[in-house]
A protein has these predicted regions:
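N-terminal Rossmann-like FAD-binding beta1-loop-alpha1 element of flavoenzymes
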Residues: 141-167, 291-299
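Glycine-rich dinucleotide-binding loop and its adjacent helix/turn
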Residues: 121-137, 195-215, 239-301, 409-419, ...
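Feature captures the FAD/FMN-dependent oxidoreductase FAD-binding
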Residues: 142-146, 194-244, 342-351, 355, ...
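Ferredoxin-type iron-sulfur electron-transfer modules in oxidoreductases and energy-metabolism complexes
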Residues: 19-37, 59-91, 108-135, 262-263, ...
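Local cysteine-cluster metal-coordination motifs and their immediate loop/turn environment
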Residues: 40-62, 84-107
Length: 463
């Protein structure tokens, strides 16, 4: 009998007044009993709308059926037919706008907790199964993947499963891309990411760190070395600023730098080589998940007050509703319909405040959201000693500048065939944030999966 409860099983989590002082994971995950109960809520619809809502096409009702039977490893095997990063996706994928949005149970009540079940299954496997996956039979072909973020790891995993010798070239000293430098420990523990990468290595994927493609080696040199195709999944790590007065003051960070120092360099630990000055009042400019991450990190680093400053209303916030809710629970203050006009400094060049102007919403712009318009005479000053800019990122131009014939958008995104990921260069594919600009982990994974299929077809057609 299906569980006809209108509500999901609640996810156990740390209390807000405890978690905003530590970097331990906020959500604690389902117990076996909760997972079994939640799985019984699935109606196993014949047309499976949830699958259509998943960018990587996980067979969702099938894995949930296995959970309901108590066959958690069987569920894991179904998920990993389509996804190389289930423990990651179960934590950071915006299921509420994808698979769960399509769930029929959501018509009346809450949808099935698909993401929570995916996380449970992946965590159960990691805790209970020690057997390494079998290496596929080598097919004699090799592929280079640039970047070890979600698109690169997905592309590498899918190709490795087909027998390709895959080498991943990562610019940083640690593999994982945005999963390790961009997403905080309390949302995505780094040991979870490492386990996913270890699983890919067990399939035969070779991960080389401290390899900046475009400097150490070029794409043309990789092709000359015998790689039959190259996938560019180098992300979008170049921060954007507002170009307002005061952005060069001490105490102004890009969210990219701030989060990298915290997440990858462990700036919150005593003796860190890349510390962050502890601020009392922090303003984070932006309204996406990155802004929420930066604000919540600042709170954990000891800031007395942390503000989100966003030029539209709460309805237009691009961040996940769950992340906004968590930020509010942890004491983050939202200054909505406000926009910075300049950052103020003291005589020593340190941030002492941020001047803002109030906004109101006008007609919709090209994004479909109502355009924010300044309210004349509404200027005010926010008393802060640190400002973090979280208003987006762009791809690094290094690969473009060292790869002849690689076409890009004016803003730097690589131009690709959307159905294959093929760039303007034969045998060179791209996906993820390097193509779209900053987007979600699961969309980057979908692009990596699409490119892996196209790369396989391309190489096999030449064999």
């Amino acid at each position: 009998m299906p569980n006809m409860s209108l509500k999901k099983n609640e996810m156990p989590s740390q209390a807000p007044d405890v978690r905003n002082k530590n970097f331990l994971e906020v959500a604690l995950g389902y117990t076996e009993e909760q997972a079994l109960d939640e799985a019984q809520r699935c109606l196993h619809c014949k047309n499976k709308p949830c699958v259509a809502g998943c960018p990587v096409g996980i067979h969702i009702p099938d894995f949930i059926a296995k959970v309901a039977e108590g066959d958690f490893e069987g569920a894991y095997q179904i998920i990993t037919q389509q996804s190389s990063l289930p423990a990651v996706c179960g934590r950071v994928c915006p299921q509420e706008t994808q698979c769960e949005q399509k769930c029929v149970r959501g018509i009346k009540g809450e949808p099935v907790g698909i993401g929570r079940l995916e996380r449970f299954v992946a965590d159960w496997h990691n805790k209970n199964v020690c057997e390494a996956p079998r290496k596929p039979t080598p097919n004699g072909h090799k592929v280079a993947v640039i970047g070890s973020g979600p698109s690169g790891l997905t592309c590498a995993g899918d190709l490795a499963k087909k027998g390709y010798a895959v080498t991943v070239f990562e610019a940083l000293h640690t593999a994982g891309g945005v999963l390790v430098y961009g997403i905080p420990e309390f949302r995505l523990p780094k040991d979870i990411v490492q386990k996913e990468i270890d699983g890919l290595k067990a399939l035969g994927v070779d991960v080389q760190t401290n390899m900046v493609i475009g400097r150490v080696l070029s794409i043309d040199e990789l092709l000359e070395q015998g790689y039959e195709a190259v996938f560019i999944g180098s992300g979008a790590g170049l921060p954007r600023f507002m170009n307002i007065p005061g952005e060069n003051l001490k105490g102004v960070y890009s969210a990219n730098e701030f989060l990298t120092r915290v997440n990858l360099m462990k700036a919150y630990q005593p003796g860190s080589d890349t510390p962050i000055e502890h601020a009392k009042r922090v303003a984070v400019v932006g309204g996406g998940n990155v802004a929420m991450d930066a604000a919540r990190c600042a709170k954990r680093l000891g800031a007395e007050e942390v503000f989100i400053v966003y030029r539209r209303s709460e309805k237009e916030l691009p961040a996940r509703a769950e992340e906004v809710e968590h930020a509010k629970e942890e004491g983050i203050v939202f200054h909505l319909l406000n926009n910075p006009t300049q950052i103020l400094g003291d005589e020593n060049g340190n941030v002492k405040g941020m001047e803002c102007i109030r906004m109101e919403l006008g007609e919709p712009d090209a994004s479909g959201r109502r355009r924010p318009v300044e309210v004349p005479g509404s200027e005010f000053t926010l008393d802060v000693d640190c400002v973090i800019m979280a208003i987006g990122t762009s791809p690094n131009p290094l690969i473009k500048s060292t790869t002849e014939g690689l076409e890009t958008q004016k803003w730097g995104g690589i131009i690709v065939n959307e159905e294959t990921g093929l760039t303007s260069r034969e045998g060179v594919y791209a996906g993820g944030d390097a193509v779209t600009g900053a987007a979600t982990v699961i969309l980057a994974m979908g692009a990596g999966k699409t490119a892996a299929t196209a790369i396989d077809q391309y190489i096999q057609s030449k064999a």
